[in-house]
A protein has these predicted regions:
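Class I SAM-dependent methyltransferase SAM/SAH-binding core
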Residues: 46-48, 52-99
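A conserved beta-strand element that flanks and buttresses the S-adenosyl-L-methionine
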Residues: 110
Length: 222
């Protein structure tokens, strides 16, 4: 099913994100190209913090997935995704990644712009649950805001990000408000800290997949 109102709502939502996040669509293109390079095609896929279903938009037209699970703690977002993608091979779970019930069930787990909203303890629990949800040799791909290594770097990166948003037509006040959320509404960690966290949670391989502005993609292999 592809309800017109759901499609409109998701398109409007995605356009607002594009005004905020540089190269937003590249997140999902990189997910697809990375999974395509894996030796075995995925049959089971969990997307945590699925939002309106942007990851599924790319995945379901690229792979013959037998089971795709949408998970989000927002019933409103989950309903939009359900309106767009309800089919026999899809499931919709309302819940928090820090409380995932899945164990050894998925070939792929994705989390796009999710885990940086948590405290250090909450982030570790979220990443550990993603690890536990994977089958052996399963793939975890996440995209997160990251923290620069210095105050000078942080100021430069934030100003650059603000300039990007201004160029997309956002108001100066909206841009300042968004940049002001750093370490108040989301809590980024450095690239090194993220990779170490993944190793601490059990991943035998942890790599940087993609990087631009203050966003990075990470790859973990169980």
């Amino acid at each position: 099913m592809n309800d017109n109102s759901s499609a409109f709502n998701s398109a409007e939502y995605d356009e607002k994100i594009r005004q905020t996040l540089p190269y937003y669509d590249d997140f999902f293109a990189n997910i697809v190209s990375t999974v395509r390079a894996c030796p075995n095609p995925p049959k089971s896929w969990l997307d945590v913090g699925c939002g309106t279903g942007k990851t599924a938009e790319y995945v379901l037209k690229s792979f013959d997935v037998e089971r795709f699970v949408f998970c989000d703690n927002s019933e409103e977002m989950l309903n939009i995704a359900r309106g767009r993608f309800s089919a026999e091979n899809t499931e919709f779970v309302i819940g928090d990644v820090r409380e995932l019930p899945f164990r050894n069930e998925f070939d792929i787990v994705t989390a796009v712009q999710v885990n940086h909203y948590f405290s250090a303890e909450g982030r570790k629990l979220a990443v550990k649950n993603c690890f536990e949800a994977l089958k052996p040799n399963g793939i975890f791909i996440s995209f997160e805001n990251f923290a620069p290594y210095s105050e000078i770097g942080k100021r430069l990166y934030l100003d650059r990000w603000k300039n990007f948003q201004l160029e997309q037509g956002r108001s100066p006040d909206a841009c300042e408000e968004h940049i002001g959320r750093y370490n108040k509404e989301y809590f980024p960690i450095t690239l090194s800290e993220q990779l170490q966290l993944m190793r601490d949670c059990g991943f035998k391989s942890a790599e940087i997949l993609w990087l631009s502005y203050m966003q990075a993609g990470f790859l973990g292999v169980k």
